[in-house]
């Protein structure tokens, strides 16, 4: 069972929170909506333990109708969460040194089948098949801590093909159709780019459990994004950077090329790379150039020339099978730079645990699609405030210490 604890001293009704709530949610057209947005934030920041609507309401109001009003605001009130996330992104960028966009996934166990997006799936973290919702978030990874700035909920075909379920959960037409995890990540990246004008940042993601990783890499390449993505060990790739011939046109698992390739080279002495090394043995980085095969079903010659990418993995004696394989288009970066970027994923996983334990990320009690997004937006705002309220606002266009590959 998770241990809930307060992450930051908080005094209810403080002027900084009032100002923050007005900056992020001031666009809401009605005064009562703005008031309940502030109340929800205050409740998330001050309520220990599980963040049910009833407990949040009790923390901020003595009114017997507060719980009903707060529930109405989150689950039934038809407000657009997009402007709040746009304002939150601008507020966050002014107070941080951005390093990367990272992708985090959260599995939210649920009872029953009525909550939007609920389905059964295997959860690698628990090793069990669970009844759950699955959320995918995009985080701004900074010099201090990642901050969530956008969310998508995975909707299996049961939820998108059934008109009755869609109407009951208020799922918009724009979210209907084949929307696997890779498409949701691409949509998050596109949306965050449309909301900010910050210096372009690399996208860092662990997609080792995703069956459409190739589609994600192609999509990121098409949009001009730099990326560092952990991929399934079985992902089929072609050797890159060598004269193409019959042998080089046969796709092979990426792990085989990285770990068993002949003469692809190693980069020694990765100072500061995350994770212990058994017996003080040296870390080394195995790496090789690869290309993605043409898309399945694509007519010959219709795909653009596949880019040359770098696949790499740490070689750590004694735990080789546990090391993920990463693919990046930052082919000119040093081993130290690449390892530093992969470290942002671990930090995002840590931020997700804090969001779950201390900010009620998994405590949404409603059933609708808008309600889920309202809750996730408010949780994101509360988390950002708890981490950055004391930071000094500065310019948003700081240069990133990453040189784009040619």
Q: Can you say where each PLM-predicted feature lies in the sequence?
A:
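A short, flexible helix-boundary coil/loop motif
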Residues: 1-19, 25-33, 155, 244-298, ...
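Gly/serine-rich nucleotide phosphate-binding loop at the start of the catalytic core
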Residues: 2-71
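Electropositive, glycine- and tryptophan-enriched low-complexity nucleic-acid-binding patches
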Residues: 126-197, 322-323
């Amino acid at each position: 069972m998770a241990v809930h604890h307060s992450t930051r001293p908080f005094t209810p009704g403080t002027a900084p929170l009032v100002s923050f709530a007005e900056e992020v949610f001031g666009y809401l057209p009605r005064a009562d909506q703005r008031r309940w947005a502030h109340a929800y934030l205050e409740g998330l920041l001050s309520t220990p333990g599980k963040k049910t609507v009833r407990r949040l309401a009790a923390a901020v109001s003595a009114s017997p109708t507060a719980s009903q009003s707060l529930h109405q605001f989150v689950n039934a009130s038809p407000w657009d969460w997009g402007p709040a996330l746009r304002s939150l992104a601008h507020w966050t960028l002014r107070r941080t040194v951005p390093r990367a966009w990272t992708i985090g996934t959260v599995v939210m166990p649920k009872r029953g089948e009525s909550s939007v997006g609920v389905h059964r799936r295997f959860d690698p973290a628990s090793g069990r098949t669970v009844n759950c919702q699955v959320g995918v978030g995009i985080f701004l990874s900074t010099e201090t801590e990642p901050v969530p700035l956008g969310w998508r909920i995975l909707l299996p075909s049961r939820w998108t093909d059934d008109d009755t379920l869609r109407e009951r959960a208020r799922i918009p037409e724009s979210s209907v159709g084949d929307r696997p995890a890779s498409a949701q990540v691409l949509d998050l990246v596109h949306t965050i780019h449309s909301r900010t004008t910050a210096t372009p940042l690399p996208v860092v993601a662990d997609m080792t459990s995703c069956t459409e990783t190739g589609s994600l890499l192609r999509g990121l390449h098409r949009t001009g994004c730099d990326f560092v993505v952990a991929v399934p060990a079985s992902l089929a790739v072609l050797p890159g950077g060598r004269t193409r011939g019959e042998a080089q046109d046969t796709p092979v698992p990426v792990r085989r090329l990285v770990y068993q390739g002949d003469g692809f080279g190693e980069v020694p002495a990765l100072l500061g790379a995350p994770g212990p090394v058994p017996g003080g043995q040296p870390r080394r980085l195995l790496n090789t150039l690869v290309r993605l095969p043409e898309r399945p079903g694509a007519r010959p010659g219709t795909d653009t020339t596949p880019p040359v990418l770098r696949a790499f993995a740490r070689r750590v004696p004694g735990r080789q099978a546990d090391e993920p394989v990463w693919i990046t288009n930052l082919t000119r970066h040093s081993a130290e730079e690449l390892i530093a970027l992969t470290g942002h994923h671990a930090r995002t996983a840590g931020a997700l645990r804090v969001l779950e334990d201390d900010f009620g990320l998994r405590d949404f009690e409603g059933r609708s699609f808008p309600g889920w997004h309202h809750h996730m937006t408010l949780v994101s705002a509360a988390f950002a405030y708890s981490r950055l309220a004391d930071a000094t606002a500065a310019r948003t266009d700081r240069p990133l210490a990453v040189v784009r590959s040619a």
